[in-house]
Amino acid sequence: WTEAQCNQLWLDILRIAEDPTTRAHFIGSVVYVSTGDTSAGFTRWLLIDGQQRVTTIMLILIALRNHIEETGWRGTEDGPTAKRVEAYFLKNLEEEGDRCPKLVLRRHDQATLRALLDRQDYPADISARIRENYEFFRERVAQVDPETIYRGIGRLVVVDVTLDRLTDDPQLIFESLNSTGMDLSQSDLIRNFVLMRLPERE
């Protein structure tokens, strides 16, 4: 997402967290299809639509976890802790390697996201957008009570759509969903077309 989109989501999170009359805030749809891979002991899902909003929320949660760790902040019993945020949203803590992150991006972006998840230095081939958006949220998280952020994120709502790989055409649905939204580049469309036809491991 652009900085303007990140800022709007951030403002929405703060607004719904502080408004006692608002119990939920709709942020769009998330469409996914099962990859058929259950080797990790759980089902892996391929995101067809909603990748950018899911990634952006993940970056907010990483920033929140890191802020809590670095400051030693403590809130209420039901409030966020670094361990709780990591276990609920960021990692499969009983898994290792590629099975550990709860979100896996395309290769270039994934290396940068994984570095943030694992508290490591950025890779040489850094994803500038992932880094910039993380740093945008890291700066803002430090200025707000973590309880407020956690409450706001908990009130975000999406429409959850599961496709059947045997009967639904993920590529057609992807193009339909994005035909009236933010313009996609030709590279986005081509990449998605290719990825829809690759085995999940590739």
Residue ranges of predicted features:
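Glycine- and hydrophobic-rich flexible loops that cap the catalytic core of alpha/beta enzyme folds
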Residues: 1-202
